Amino acid sequence: MSLSSLAISANNISYRIGSKIILDDINLELRCGEVTTLLGPNGAGKSTLLKLLCDEITSFNDIRYFGKAKDQWDGNELAKRLGVLPQHSTLSFAFNVNEVVELGGLPLSLSNQALREITSNMMQKTVIKHLAERAYPSLSGGEKQRVHLARVLTQVSQHQQKIVMLDEPTSALDLSHQHNTLKLARELASEGAAVIVVLHDLNLAAQYSDRVIVLQDGKLQADGAPWEAITSKMIENVYGHKTLVQAHPTLNFPVVFAA
């Protein structure tokens, strides 16, 4: 693997709160051009791992972005390459949707016209252009989620080599927007980004991921392509539920059925 294709390297990642071990000696290398999905039951450590990887939680773990430690990066430059959609985004000001999306341009050196063009494009991709003048607090949960996705996409729009982290980006979305969001993740990866997604839906993970990482009680339980990681045995061991995993009738990914 060339260094340029390695977006994140994280060695011996551990985290605890008091005596509770949240993550236990996780080693990861995340590559450009791939969608990597984190799976696992509630409390497995998925969101904590994402927060450590993006430095939302300060730690002394060895995490590198594109081969450089965080303290070797200029903060503004890293912000242009590392976009994070948290599980919950709050905003109390009555900005309209267009203004919220434009907040993603803060680390960028762009003319007003260039920023308007980028935000318009990202709003089109996330299907929120019709909401442009709506006050953000008046939106539904799913609409707010798509607004923040457009903001994150605006933030990282100027670099082909970038990292996009999405923590449960489909949790408030209807079926159509779930698939649109994960198609955008695939599009980003095809353009060279490293995309890391936290999901609960195993079938969405199987359909849209290049790689699936399964956590349980802070430990790595599976790591591989969807066919390698999403198996009936893994699901029973990790989730305690019997399932049947079969091939999609026309597409090459596993489909999980309740047994």
From Swiss-Prot:
Among PANTHER family, the record links this protein to:
HEMIN IMPORT ATP-BINDING PROTEIN HMUV (PTHR42794:SF1)
Q: What is its EC number?
A: 7.6.2.-
State the SUPFAM superfamilies in the record: P-loop containing nucleoside triphosphate hydrolases
Membrane topology listed for this record: Peripheral membrane protein
Every copy of the ABC transporter domain together lies at 8-242
Cellular compartment(s):
Cell inner membrane
What is this organism's lineage? Bacteria, Pseudomonadati, Pseudomonadota, Gammaproteobacteria, Vibrionales
Q: Name one Pfam family in it.
A: ABC_tran
Instruction: Summarize the protein's role.
Output: Part of the ABC transporter complex HmuTUV involved in hemin import. Responsible for energy coupling to the transport system.
Claim: Repeat is one of the keywords in the record: no
In which family does this protein belong, per the annotation? Belongs to the ABC transporter superfamily. Heme (hemin) importer (TC 3.A.1.14.5) family.
Instruction: Outline the subunit composition.
Output: The complex is composed of two ATP-binding proteins (HmuV), two transmembrane proteins (HmuU) and a solute-binding protein (HmuT).
Of the GO CC terms on this record, one is:
plasma membrane
Chief place of localization: membrane
PROSITE patterns tied to this protein: ABC_TRANSPORTER_2, HMUV
Molecular function via GO: ATP binding; ATP hydrolysis activity
Output the superkingdom of the source species: Bacteria
At which positions is ATP bound?
Answer: G40, P41, N42, G43, A44, G45, K46, S47
Question: Could you tell me the keywords of this UniProt record?
Answer: ATP-binding, Cell inner membrane, Cell membrane, Membrane, Nucleotide-binding, Translocase, Transport
What is the name of the protein in this document?
Answer: Hemin import ATP-binding protein HmuV
The record's section on InterPro entries has: AAA+_ATPase (IPR003593), ABC_transporter-like_ATP-bd (IPR003439), P-loop_NTPase (IPR027417)
Its gene? hmuV
* EC class name: translocase
Does this UniProt record's set of keywords contain DNA damage?
Answer: no
Species this chain originates from: Aliivibrio fischeri (strain ATCC 700601 / ES114)
